[in-house]
Amino acid sequence: MQTLADLLNTIPAIDPAAMSRAQRHIDGLLKPVGSLRRLEALAIQLAGMPGLTGIPHVGKKAVLVMCADHGVWEEGVAISPKEVTGIQAENMTRGTTGVCMLAAQAGANVHVIDVGIDTAEPIPGLINMRVARGSGNIASAPAMSRRQAEKLLLDVICYTRELAKNGVTLFGVGELGMANTTPAAAIVSTITGRDPEEVVGIGANLPTDKLANKIDVVRRAITLNQPNPQDGVDVLAKVGGFDLVGMAGVMLGAASCGLPVLLDGFLSYAAALAACQMSPAIKPYLIPSHLSAEKGARIALSHLGLEPYLNMEMRLGEGSGAALAMPIIEAACAIYNNMGELAASNIVLPGNTTSDLNS
């Protein structure tokens, strides 16, 4: 069986020649050069991904939702009962949650994966990759062992690669877990070097009078566990959670197949920061769907060098933003593959990117 290091070494580089060809093709389409801006840039980015073989296209779509509980819930950093994780995961299997609605609209399948829900028995209908019944309380101990983190990463990478073999070409990540914005903030603080006060937000409607405690919990977790910001696995194992590890695994797995993965909100930014520490080569495969309303979102995205496509003031999680942005990916592919060409219409435009066909 391949090790994590072996799999990380298989992540292919983006193909600059394919991107150059895509740029020339797009510049010849029936529009002023550059007039579709970020949509054009997205199509060119997709063309450079080896898994799409130089032609931006979307086959099957999948949103992978990592579900887990967190020991740090005991510190009073969330107002929702811990049992909500299992209840909502079960609702996902019925197709009744927010991500299920948005994924259905986008034509994507939702894979609900138990990586650490705190229930006595596995929940029927979930994909069972459970490591433990919740992670450790990061305010008093590591979230998990390094071995547990590496094994879960490998399991999720392999699952993602298997989906790719079965025709999935566009992945989205999501999560579900009460109190999980606390470890996410700890990861963001650790890797960006920003103070917890700058990145800790209210999560799922935490009252503002409880925010100081949440900031203190994140600060204590980092001080106690001393995660190495240069080592993504170490950060995830010490101050992360199983859902965050799982999302990082999807990113690494998709990138190893040369395929795009849509980020969701703040939790996914944290997982992406850790994944990029493991392999900077994955960064061109990450597509930011929307700007999370969580406090540390801009800090995390700035560190990643990513600019989201949507700003809907959302902070639901679940992969809702990733599902919502899937039609944008398809739109970029549509203009690339289906638009007419200037030459075929005998239109000659001056080399002015601000020109307009109607001017």
Curated annotation (Swiss-Prot):
It comes from Shigella dysenteriae serotype 1 (strain Sd197). InterPro entries: Nict_dMeBzImd_PRibTrfase, Nict_dMeBzImd_PRibTrfase_bact, Nict_dMeBzImd_PRibTrfase_N, Nict_dMeBzImd_PRibTrfase_sf. The active site is at residue 318. Keywords: Cobalamin biosynthesis, Glycosyltransferase, Transferase. The keyword Kinase does not apply. GO terms for biological process: cobalamin biosynthetic process. CDD domains: DMB-PRT_CobT (cd02439). It catalyses: 5,6-dimethylbenzimidazole + nicotinate beta-D-ribonucleotide = alpha-ribazole 5'-phosphate + nicotinate + H(+). It comes from the Bacteria. The keyword DNA-binding does not apply. This is Nicotinate-nucleotide--dimethylbenzimidazole phosphoribosyltransferase. Homodimer. Its EC number is 2.4.2.21. Belongs to the CobT family. Catalyzes the synthesis of alpha-ribazole-5'-phosphate from nicotinate mononucleotide (NAMN) and 5,6-dimethylbenzimidazole (DMB). Pathway: Nucleoside biosynthesis; alpha-ribazole biosynthesis; alpha-ribazole from 5,6-dimethylbenzimidazole: step 1/2. PANTHER family: NICOTINATE-NUCLEOTIDE--DIMETHYLBENZIMIDAZOLE PHOSPHORIBOSYLTRANSFERASE. Gene3D superfamilies: 1.10.1610.10, 3.40.50.10210. It holds the Pfam family DBI_PRT. One of its GO terms (molecular function) is nicotinate-nucleotide-dimethylbenzimidazole phosphoribosyltransferase activity.
